[in-house]
């Protein structure tokens, strides 16, 4: 699934879907979710639709799409997440709603003291030591408690037991949130956690190997690439341990000119391997954005991504 844009970053068509039986040869299956011509629609032409992700719900037999939505004419102020459903992965997906997650719900890793507002909360200057301390202590969680938490760059993850999670950049892009979805994957249960408060992570991509969860993220440099970050945890809600930059070798400082978007598990009868999928943005011509795919391996408990000019997928293993 990908964002169909023109030269700018606004949605003009919707979310396009491609299919493949071998991960080499791909078919353009058309538009899975169309923007609306109704100017009053939340997904009208000219809104911002980013990071679409689709998961399948075994119980309802629905394909569920979540995405980052910004309302037309509001820049990136809305910070909402939208949801749509379809009986087919090809669509058409029916748009249901958008909102900010977990209104009226405190994170599970938030103390009683953190819930108390301070008289100085609205007077702090950004990037000062006082602001940084307040941010880590939940400044924006408290601010957005009633209306719901901000949700921008996002991904989805379905665990072994069928539980699904919505992982998104929140708190003015300063902190990641991991939020549990309802059994039908169409809403939030209210159980959520703050991850790496004040860590300035976006573009989350998450996967699980054995009983360990791994996550790769990006720093905040707009459309420009930066060194990736990696983390691991034994519980989806953390605590998450920082592992450093998973990219190794030349151009690792810009993650091979990419930003994380998804980690694709490749499953065989005997093993599972993983492919790092990264976006190569072109801010001067957004429709010309590209992907890079590289093998991802776990070495000494840490994910590693190395550049290869060419590589082959053999079952669930990789060959140069």
Language-model segments: residues:
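Carbohydrate-active catalytic/glycan-binding domains of CAZyme proteins
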Residues: 1-320
């Amino acid at each position: 699934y990908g964002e169909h844009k023109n030269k700018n970053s606004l949605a003009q068509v919707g979310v396009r879907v491609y299919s493949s039986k071998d991960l080499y040869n791909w078919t353009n299956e058309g538009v899975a979710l169309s923007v609306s011509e109704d100017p009053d629609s939340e997904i009208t032409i000219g809104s911002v639709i980013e990071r679409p992700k689709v998961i399948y719900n075994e119980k309802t037999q629905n394909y569920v799409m979540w995405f980052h939505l910004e309302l037309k004419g509001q820049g990136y102020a809305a910070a909402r997440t939208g949801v749509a459903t379809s009986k087919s992965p090809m669509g058409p997906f029916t748009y249901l709603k958008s909102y900010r997650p977990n209104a009226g719900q405190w994170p599970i890793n938030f103390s009683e003291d953190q819930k108390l507002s301070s008289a100085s909360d609205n007077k702090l200057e950004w990037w000062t030591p006082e602001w940084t301390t307040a941010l880590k202590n939940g400044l924006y969680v408290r601010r957005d408690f009633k209306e719901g938490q901000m949700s921008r760059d996002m991904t989805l993850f379905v665990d072994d037991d069928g539980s699904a999670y919505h992982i998104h950049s929140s708190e003015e892009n300063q902190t990641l949130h991991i939020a549990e979805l309802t059994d039908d994957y169409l809403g939030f249960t209210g159980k959520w956690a703050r991850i790496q408060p004040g860590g300035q992570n976006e573009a989350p991509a998450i996967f699980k190997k054995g009983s360990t969860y791994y996550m790769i993220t990006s720093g905040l440099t707009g459309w420009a690439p930066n060194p990736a970050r990696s983390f691991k945890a034994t519980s989806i809600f953390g605590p998450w341990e920082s592992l450093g930059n998973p990219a190794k070798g030349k151009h690792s400082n810009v993650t091979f000119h990419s930003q994380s978007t998804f980690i694709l598990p490749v499953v065989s009868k005997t093993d599972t391997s993983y492919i790092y999928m990264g976006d190569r943005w072109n801010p001067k011509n957004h429709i010309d954005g590209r992907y890079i795919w590289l093998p991802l391996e776990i070495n000494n408990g840490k994910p590693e991504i190395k550049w290869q000019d060419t590589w082959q997928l053999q079952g669930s293993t990789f060959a140069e």
